[in-house]
Amino acid sequence: MKFSIQHARDAEFRADGLREYFEYRDLGIRDATGGHAVMHVIRARKGTNATGEWHRHEVGLQLVYVLRGWARFEYEGVGEVLMEAGTCVHQPPGIRHRELAHSEDFEVLEIVTPADFRTESVPPPPGTAGAR
């Protein structure tokens, strides 16, 4: 592990992350922790919308803290959730979920362990829209 510092004035957002409707700012934690964790700021890309695709992540820990704007997600066993500035969400490992919509100014801080984790598309959970 090593010291790391990132400044907003040097921020670079990239559109090469997990979702095409978001931009990602790497905060250097993957490198600082030797891959034990990743931390980034994620924001909505202008002119894009959520796809509503059900998926899950193979993670040890996933925390999301909303910095600005809002988003509506749907979680297996929970239902629809509105996230807005100040909301903190712990997504248990493997929980099926999908994003339904977000504001143009939606921005979150996300922390995930490990840094390299698997994401897979999954069928809708029983009792949700599109389930068989």
Please place each PLM-identified region on the residue numbering.
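Double-stranded beta-helix
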Residues: 2-9, 98-132
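A generic structural motif
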Residues: 74-76, 100
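N-terminal presequences and immediately downstream first alpha-helices
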Residues: 1-21
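A generic "binding-loop/recognition-motif" signal
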Residues: 59, 79, 95-96, 104-105
